[in-house]
């Protein structure tokens, strides 16, 4: 059994190279050979071992005795000694355990021997074999030689997760051996199916064995083995044991020290690590930089005089240092002679501090470039050179550079934002970013990204406490989890609301920024701010003549009334003496001719001259009372309302006048307009002296009868109205008569005499009563229609 293992090691070596070389020929990948000279010696030795192993294979098929076993033991020992030459070669790439390029299976496990994971072989033998003797375990545990005949079937380890691709059947020369598992994650595409090369070998009973062709010189194996599609980011943390075969693949894991669930590097960036360099695994942490480079960065930020200079310097340093660390020149440059960025480079467009209304760059941060260490812990290892420790950490050495990380993506150049946008994803296939709304870029849409508005106040810069980076929120294991969840209905609504474009948004931002772009102090107002309430000329209202008081010089007694739209001319305004003469003239003209149009125009002209000159005296009260009486007599209640409103204001200034009379008129006017609110207010401010006034007492009694629906008392009071109260009651007397008529028709049966109705509703005569009843469409009865048929007229009550 041990001999079989030794034969497996030798044949696997040549088979692997035959397989890969065949794949390279098929794909047309003829690359120049760059290999160690020791490989050629190894292949020659292994070729001879393979031939002797093939000769001993026929004896194995007929006899499994100790002679064959001893032969294979010697072959295994020779293979193990050959392998020891390359064990140190693997160690320079920091592999903790021997590296296996292929599947970790013993070739002859299937003949009854247990596999590495305790599983039986995929096919059995006619004669079950016993496990190897304990003395051969050391040989089995020696580092394996890369390569194994893929035509031999195997059983996949139980710890491996199944691949997304189903198992591929073997080619016809190997039809008896079917793969029982999918390709291992991270292996080359050539390992997912059998090679179609010529198969010339000897048979072990029903099983066909292919002697591999000598590999063609070409590119080294680990440079040709690219990961299968969809498997570059997968990785499994299989428990490793010393000197045990592992399932690591150079195509998917460039560094043996990677954690099983750690961030994965890009396979295309790490497949060219054939040259040994001490800085092949660069880190973005300043602790890993050369001392000259650290001093250079400090000099750059020390030379900055303002925050804008720091922003510009930070942006330039990101470009320079990132390129130098990637190509390795950062360790060879004399940084003490390197000029500062501002001395040799022109300021890049948009290099000053970005305005907060400008959209930020939509570029995604590089994969693996945003893993920030938390609490000064160990930095997360990334495959991208110079991008492993790009984030800021509390209390780390970034404070030496002015709290600026020169490797952060230029997502926002504002120095006031302490936590920049960083990659919160855990795999290379996600590009979600998390940015705070207090960054200078107000919104950034990259693909399907949406940056919600959230926290406003940035954390204090340069503080090392636990609350200095509250925007990071969750731990390393939880970071980015919110992006992995499916968006809920509420979040979709919020995102839709954020994505709504406001056409005025940019204009508003520019106006808002224009107010703060100049840092000058606010100038104090030399004069107190006065709110002008008189600027209503455009709306058609009268100007405030209190500010335009003049003394008129016009001697004219009569003057046409015109609305003023500008400052009044004193030559067109009459003084008080002339206005008194004009008022007497208007009174006489009204008594003689009853020309309301002329009287109203002259009264309004007098009122205007008084207002322009700011005259509010006893004469002003007389003018308004005269105009109110003329309007009442003519029935112009609009003009009366203007006059009584001004009279109420003048009476409040304790100017003498007919206060009781016009208070009664005001109460009756409120009854006419059915303004119960103003009536209640007026009643509340009535003094005892006013209540004792005859006009006010009459108005209060009339209001009580109106409120109670007592039409009999109402019309009795109407007939005995003092002064000019009757003119106001005339405005709503017919309305109250209809209400009273409805009540009478409902009450009186079968007929209602017209004579009784005339007396009860306070008509002056029967003719006036008939004129009132005629348009109502009532039914009459009796001789000469002297009575109203209440039963027939009941249907007409709804019409009035």
UniProtKB/Swiss-Prot annotation:
Q: Give start and end of each PCI domain.
A: 636-800
Q: Which residues form a coiled coil?
A: none
Output a single Gene Ontology CC term carried by this record: protein-containing complex
List compositional bias (Polar residues) regions by residue number.
124-142, 178-197, 245-256
Q: Where is the composition biased (Basic and acidic residues)?
A: 32-43
Q: Does the keyword Acetylation apply?
A: yes
* Keyword Transmembrane listed: no
Modified sites of kind N-acetylalanine: 2
What are the Phosphoserine sites (modified residues) in this protein? 351
Give the span(s) annotated as Disordered: 24-66, 118-291, 328-506
Q: Name one Pfam family in it.
A: SAC3_GANP
Q: Which UniProt keywords apply?
A: Acetylation, Phosphoprotein
Recorded superkingdom: Eukaryota
The residue ranges flagged as biased composition, category Low complexity, are 47-65, 412-427
What is annotated about its quaternary structure and interactions? Answer: May be part of a SEM1-containing complex.
Q: Which PANTHER family match?
A: 80 KDA MCM3-ASSOCIATED PROTEIN (PTHR12436), LEUKOCYTE RECEPTOR CLUSTER MEMBER 8 (PTHR12436:SF4)
Name of the featured protein = Leukocyte receptor cluster member 8
- Name the source organism: Homo sapiens
Q: Which gene encodes it?
A: LENG8
